[in-house]
Regions:
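Intrinsic disorder/low-complexity signal
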Residues: 47, 71, 86, 142-145
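Coil-to-alpha-helix initiation sites in intrinsically disordered, low-complexity, charged segments
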Residues: 1-5, 78, 145
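Canonical phosphoinositide-binding patch of PH/PH-like domains
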Residues: 115-145
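Phosphoinositide-binding peripheral membrane targeting modules
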Residues: 53-115, 130-136, 155
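Non-membrane alpha-helical secondary structure
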Residues: 15-22, 71, 136-139, 143
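Anionic N-terminal interaction surfaces
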Residues: 2-66
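Short linear sequence elements within intrinsically disordered, low-complexity coil regions
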Residues: 35, 45, 49-51, 94-96, ...
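Alpha-helical oligomerization segments
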Residues: 149-154
Length: 155
């Protein structure tokens, strides 16, 4: 990685090369777990939860590959290196799922059994606190707003 790549990683959270590699990994992971995976739009999303104990603040980080298409959302929990991969969760009308978007909680998907709140990430500067817990990826503002519009519209 040259100087440009190093600077880009520091300010954007990922070099273009690293981001493209991670997007390809995400697609491969998704397609292995989801039938007709290429028919879904993929986004990397994350969530953070905070607990304030008496002496220490605890932050829990979660990473997700989220695929969406008309009438369905699939969520796959992953780690920041895309090596520890969870099961896929499918949400649609058939299993009484709901999707929502709000400026305060970002994207929500859930049914009677499980739910997720997450934020689609545009970029995360590597110099920000907690960036080492997130997938190194750059997603465009348009990609993020398209996902937000999808979640606002609901199923």
């Amino acid at each position: 990685m040259g100087l440009k790549g190093i600077l880009q990683k520091a300010f954007m959270g990922a070099s273009t090369e690293e981001s493209n590699e991670n997007k390809e990994k995400m697609r491969q992971i998704f397609n292995r777990q989801v039938e007709n995976g290429n028919s879904y739009t993929l986004m990397y999303c994350y969530a953070e939860s905070y607990t304030n104990a008496i002496l220490v603040e605890i932050t829990k980080h979660a990473n997700f590959i989220v695929g969406y298409k008309e009438g369905e959302v699939v969520v796959i929990p992953v780690d920041a290196d895309l090596t520890d991969i969870g099961d896929s969760y499918i949400f649609n009308k058939a299993n009484n799922s709901q999707i929502k978007y709000s400026a305060f909680t970002s994207c929500f998907v859930g049914n009677d059994e499980i739910s997720f709140n997450f934020i689609p990430m545009e970029y995360r500067p590597a110099i920000n606190r907690g960036s080492e817990y997130k997938v190194a990826i750059i997603q465009s503002h348009k990609e993020v707003t398209d996902m937000q519009k999808f979640f606002k519209a609901g199923f």
